Amino acid sequence: KRIDWRVRVTGEGEATVRMKALTDEESDAVEMSFPCFVHGMLKTDSFSGVVRAAKENTDSQSITIRVPEERRPDQTRLEVRYSPTLAGAMVDALPYLVEYPYGCTEQTLNRFIPTVITQRILQKMGLNLADIRDKRTNLNAQEIGNDTERAKRWKTFEPNPVFDEDEVERMVKQGVERLTSMQLSDGGWGWFSGRGERSWSHTTAVVVHGLQTATKNDVALVPGMLDRGVAWLKNYQAEQVQYLKNNLIKNVEQRKKKRTKSQADNLDAFVFLVLNDAGLIDEEMRDFLYRDRTHLSVYGKAVYGLALHSQGQAEKLAMILQNIEQFVVEDAENQTAYLNLPNGGYWWYWWGNDLEANAWYLKLLAKTDPKSDRTAGLVKYILNNRRNGTYWRSTRDTAYCIEALADYLTASGEAEPDMTIEVLVDGKLHKSVKVDSSNLFNFDNKLILEGDALTSGEHVVEVRRSGKGPVYFNAYLTNFTLEDFITKAGLEVKVDRSFYLLMRVDKETKVAGSRGQVVDQKVEKYERKKLENLDTVKSGDLLEVELTIESKNDYEYLVFEDMKGAGFESVDVRSGYNGNEMGAYVEYRDEKVALFV
């Protein structure tokens, strides 16, 4: 006969249980130790908000936080971070580009172009690169942690030339000289431009676009260098136009004798923009691109839209913007916007790159609607999706993201903040900071309240701005909560957990026997019953745990820890890859199951 005892855990630590069975003849005993954990956890509630730039001199936004009664007061902490610009965080990526150890054509270009762009913006703000060498302020208000420790990522390579203006000038000169030597005899560029190399249209367009950006930022080029590259692209575009026109020949026999092209493509759109920026407008290509706009990727549409804006083609531009808008996703909770690209069949091509597509769309919005909520949301999304902390996936997409953020900084006015930021809790002023371009990288960017400074109950946190410009802010409330029912929390990543009771069902299916006859065979079958909070289960019941994960960003690799309930044991006992649909590596531990996704 089985006998169960119900016990109550009165404290954390290790509990030793000794069971004895005593009789007059034979007796036995067993002793085991069990870990006893507190019914509680360190929990962080995250909040995001923005005080938009407006005509009104003073404006504010508020959030409401709740500090639980059942908690460890010494582990209560409220951190509020604020910034007048998120785009200014682009400077974090410069050291990566400068120190990139390889030197193909694109990498040679993007070692110095983003630094030059940033340098010119800083000069307009009355700053220089040396001013941000020892920057103390993390302008990305979404990131928590020690700003100084985060800044150490910049200094992997010492001394980093990106902060020395004389070194930057030498770096730019060397880059221009190397690109000049890599230019082929026909005026174009190849990948490495070595022996046997040929000019590639996309590579040449990338280089010419970069050199155009360089000249706009007062970089001196070798005479004729840029003109030869433009001439190569002009000839390339003329060929593509002719192929498109040949495809319109009605006589089939005559058309077969010609090289044809059925539709204008994404490369045509990129070359069209680069030549447009050189003052060369091919109206036939413009019309072909508009005719074939539905065949362009979202990336290609954004690039084409920039050229249309430059040419004053308002009607065509409005249609392109409308075409792109159907792929825009906006999230009011964390104030982001991004393109949900339908590029499952071509994501590995340059025109399917999601980061670059968002960057070029940001460049387009910086021209057409720089002060909209959507444009600011796109900036936030691009920053959120830095794959490597301070930079993105590659030198090229990092360079384009910096270029787009720089365009936004200039167009939105965020490069010239002039404001006072105040943080109030329950109407009481706790922080007041004056921010302008002179202290943008060194102002006090956070308020921290800990322990007894926060009482139990609800509190209203208000971020107030007086002056010019927006304020982006995030608040993080951390408690070691001891509540009987711990509620879920999350912002960028959310996890919902459900428990199901699995009840065995007698089920048979017909299969072929050893002689080919039809036989009934029992199969494993269960019905699922969802369990609610405080439902009771008994020892031996089989439960299924379901985790539903929602993510606002694209992540490469995450770990999810699912803490076990008291007395729960995993049915599977061997950790590793088990063929689950997510391809997750699973570790079964005493107190939790960890999923490496």
Describe each model-derived feature in a short phrase.
Residues K1-A29, G40, D59-E70, T76, ...:
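Long, domain-scale non-catalytic interaction/scaffolding regions in large secretory-pathway
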Residues T10-E14, P101-T105, K152-F157, F163-E169, ...:
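A conserved hydrophobic secondary-structure block that centers on an alpha-helix together
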Residues E25, A29-E158:
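Secretory-pathway-linked proteins and extracytosolic
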Residues M90-Y100, S181-S193, E283, D287, ...:
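Extracellular-facing binding/remodeling surfaces
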Residues Y96, I113-N128, N146-E165, V206-V219, ...:
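Well-ordered alpha-helical scaffold segments within catalytic/enzyme domains
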Residues D147-V172, E177, K258-S262, D520-T536:
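Intrinsically disordered, low-complexity acidic Ser/Thr-rich regulatory segments
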Residues V172, S185, V222-L226, V230, ...:
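Core helices of alpha-solenoid repeat scaffolds
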